[in-house]
From Swiss-Prot:
Source species: Bartonella henselae (strain ATCC 49882 / DSM 28221 / CCUG 30454 / Houston 1)
Required cofactor names: Mg(2+)
Gene for this chain: pnp
GO cellular component, one term: cytosol
Molecular function GO terms recorded: 3'-5'-RNA exonuclease activity; magnesium ion binding; polyribonucleotide nucleotidyltransferase activity; RNA binding
Function: Involved in mRNA degradation. Catalyzes the phosphorolysis of single-stranded polyribonucleotides processively in the 3'- to 5'-direction.
Keyword Phosphoprotein part of the UniProt annotation: no
Record protein name field: Polyribonucleotide nucleotidyltransferase
Signal peptide: none
Keywords on record: Cytoplasm, Magnesium, Metal-binding, Nucleotidyltransferase, RNA-binding, Transferase
EC number(s) recorded for this UniProt protein: 2.7.7.8
Similarity remark: Belongs to the polyribonucleotide nucleotidyltransferase family.
Amino acid sequence: MFKTHKIEIEWAGRPLTLETGKIARQADGAVIATYGETIVLATVVSAKSPKPDQDFFPLTVNYQEKSYAVGRIPGGYLKRESRPSENETLISRLIDRPIRPLFADGYKNDTQVIVSVIQHDLENNPDILAMIASSAALTLSGVPFMGPIAGARVGYCNGQYILNPHIDEMSESKLDLVVAGTENAVLMVESEAQELPEDIMLGAVMFGHKGLQPILDAIIKLAEVAAKDPRDFVPEDLSDLETAMLEMAEKDIRKAYTITDKQERYAALDALKTEIINKFMPETEEDCKFSVDQIATVFKQLQAKIVRSNILDTKKRIDGRDLSTVRPIQSEVGILPRTHGSALFTRGETQAIVVATLGTGEDEQYIDSLTGMYKETFLLHYNFPPFSVGETGRLGSPGRREIGHGKLAWRAIHPMLPSKESFPYTIRAVSEITESNGSSSMATVCGTSLALMDAGVPLARPVAGIAMGLIKEGERFAVLSDILGDEDHLGDMDFKVAGTANGITALQMDIKIDGITEEIMKIALEQAKGGRIHILNEMAKALTSARAELSEFSPRIEVMNIAVDKIRDVIGTGGKVIREIVEQTGAKINIEDDGTIRIASADAKTIEAAKRWIHSIVDEPEVGVIYQGTVVKTAEFGAFVNFFGSRDGLVHISQLTTERVTKTTDVVKEGDKVWVKLMGFDERGKVRLSMKIVDQKTGKEIIGEDSIKAEQEKYTEETHKSENKRRRKKKEE
């Protein structure tokens, strides 16, 4: 019934298998990939023809994690998987980025790649396996995909690179790097690092590229026996149109690209484009040789050729800069004084307002992943409104690009954050891109670093980021620092590097062509380092380190620790006690399983009141210490005083005052506030208190130290006499 094909190899000490022909047979391509005991299903379907007037390649990649893969039922009311999580969105982008450049130019058929994690062993991360399975399914599908590609994860521990470390090994690694590529070229890199130098990062990229070669061989072997016939696809030949347009418009295109202002340049190019379309479009549709989309496509190609050749020939760029110069930078902090921290970072025509907010344990984000539930204390959100590029557009939930850019900035900042023990706040940074002409994600990194320091977050060191580009034609190439949006679109590489003066914390690279050598990447990294140091120096003009004090509008958090067996006492039955503390004091209280308690409030007195309350629950009263209490009951032999949380003690009638007392209520009544000293405990553990040796106005002791022992002995004797008298009277009755 099934005609299956299977390839199995040993990779990084674990078995990896690729199988096709049994599941999802109606898809154009389908592969079951297994690594260890993690299993993913990847499918590819591409439409047989493009939609009318389609002027772009509509590729969609959907990565989804099924809860049943780890034997769990989804939470929530519906009890089923719903909208993609942030992690699923990021992995969808991770798969998309290396495969998109490998589709044939001009291919515009609707194409969808769906990857599902159907089993997870909690040891082998499914993201790399999903990338491999997607590449294999595309290679088998017959669509014009110039692959295969493969991916690998690289860790770095004790001076050694690790290929595909287990999930639990990553906690010890100073590097989390994902690399994807073909046999001869690196296409994509994504990483977070602990301030590693450029040579270590480059070595990791090359180590990973070498490590993924066996996967490429396995996919090719599978394709030799299972691939479908290639689809008939012949790219449009628009060479005649290109020649004619070049003769007509080359001079005007070059002139437009001498305009350094983005908006003015775009206006000139739009006017030129309209003029060209009008010249090539006859009055009647029957006489049309080319469509508007074809004319627009060739116009864009001509722009790329002219800009690229001009950069290679003159070493000058669109805005007049040389290859390594960074645009002018202006940094400001504290621009929103009532927020906890804020910064405005402007680099050329790219600008970000970043605002930092400090919260408590209640503000931590609960993240439900296949590996389990965990709490995130650092949140970074990136917003890219349409007005930032002078356009109109929708507003709403963040798109994939916004999520991806935010995560890149998160990776850049995260290694420099203080530990939760030394800075027990939940931190949220929001980057509002107000202008954009290239490298807005790196502006977010710079702005976030400044805003956090303005908020008093003690970063280990400031962090800056820079986006690099590449123009390559044959053996000639130019590496560009701090690229513009046009240089990103028309170039061959988008290479973002973020870090401190000591090393790299995040790196993201997308390469659109083959032939990027190790030497070119080395030059790009060194040039990026110079740019990063320059940006850090410019940022230092605004702020060099975290402010010594938090904003007056920030919450204060104090940490205390209690014994684990006392947690239930603080929480109380059904949370009764903790709710009462919160309601009465106004403080926010977070209790962790190890007995760590975080108390938060903008008011120091509120925090102190909550601390005293908790201490009164978990601490034991100390003999010889004076406490303030409340009379809760009176009797003929004395008064009961609540003096330590829920703890009550007896002040014997002889200890109410230095004068002789015949009736307790002559001295105190229920509800009175009194000062008492803890004298000790009787043989039954009952508390013995005294009022007469404490000044009731000041709460200070009024009997000298030499008399304390005698007073305690007298107290014990009188208490025994009173107790014996009470028992005799009760017996007589």
